[in-house]
Amino acid sequence: MEKSTQERFRRVIRVSAAISRHFESNREHHREDNNWLEMLFKELLVALKIHGIVIFKPDPNSVAPRKGNAKSLLRNVSPSVVLLVVSSSYGIHYAASSFTSLGRNPNGLLSLFSDVAYLFRIATALFTAFYMTSVSTSVSSLLSDSTTIFQKTLPPNAIKSIRGYVIGMFVFAFANLLAFLGVKLTELYQSGFDGYYNYNLYDLAPESKSVIYYAVPALDIAFCTIIITMPKWIMGFHVSVCKYLGCQAVSLSGTFASERVVVLKRAREFREYHSALCELIFRFDEIFNLVLFFWYADIIISFVLSVPYIIIRTDNSTPWTYAFVIIDVACNVALLVVFNMAASDPGRLARDAQLVVLKMSSRADPDDVRLNHELLLLANAVKVAKVEMSGWNCFDVQRGLTITVLSMLSTYVVIVYQMMHHTL
């Protein structure tokens, strides 16, 4: 009896040790996947982390617990919470200062277009920060699952293409930040510190020109620039992930289309991989389809309201102000085009998969009943995925839609210019 009890305890200990080793290996594998993804998107992830949005959170088991004093509580405050508080506070401040400056600013009515555009961009930044705070875990899980499912099967040229997109979007977002910073600095240079206090800081300039006198406008410009350009980093990350999913689709189709001999196992693997990738794209669409509408609205409204401001202020602004505003508008239009191009990239899966099925069917043995049945299931799965993908908000993008939007915007510019030319 005593021996059987000891044997039972030993068995329980062995099973517990095996379970712990299993979970530890899974945790290590998951951490390796995250490290690989962090290296793939490292520039944009660092920029998002600076802004308070953390996609890949650290493992809670690897973080040592801290004592419950006031200093540790401040350390444990999420940076995203700080971002939300700062964004909302600055949005209220900017709305109030814009409203109160209408009576004091001689160009108040002329700058009303840009003020409304900036208010909407601040509101978009606040909503984006709140939304990304709530879905950052889902985005991290989606990217980790994609690496686990496809086991890092991306070819080197696909990885190089994704890295090019990541670096390009990083440079683009940073250029947009510099352009907007240039707009605010030239505004400060043109109005002077006293004028900046009068128009943007409720005419609360300190009497003595101390460090605070120069620091407050600098902080105001820094906060405004960081908050308004913050969504551009997230848009760049969204475009890069679209490219990543598109490369997964191209790699998957190319791998199976190049096989000369079709067997039952490979046909079933293609159907499973195709379904898994469609599920990942569907999850990505569910995560970003809501905020995508606000991003498009932000881009178009900024363009629509900035064009009259540029035309009205041509004779009153310095060449640098004019140039920086044009760069900011051009970045928004370029982002609209890049957005549509990247969003249509995962849609290759629906087109290329049909070609792969046709190639596999032409090479299959007509007498192999099980293989042909599997190919029939694969063809049906591809057709169903194509129908579902046509209703996904993030990826139902056509070239004609982009051309139509750009034509409408260019027509709008011409009409506004003619109207302003005859009015002024």
Question: Where does each model-flagged region fall?
Answer:
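Amphipathic, non-membrane alpha-helical segments in soluble helical-bundle scaffolds
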Residues: 110-113, 136, 212-215, 235-242, ...
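Terminal membrane-anchoring module of integral membrane proteins
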Residues: 2-81, 167-175, 264-424
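Generic structural signal for well-ordered, non-membrane alpha-helices
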Residues: 121, 144-151, 247-254, 272-275, ...
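Cytoplasmic membrane-interface regions of multi-pass membrane proteins
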Residues: 61-63, 138-156
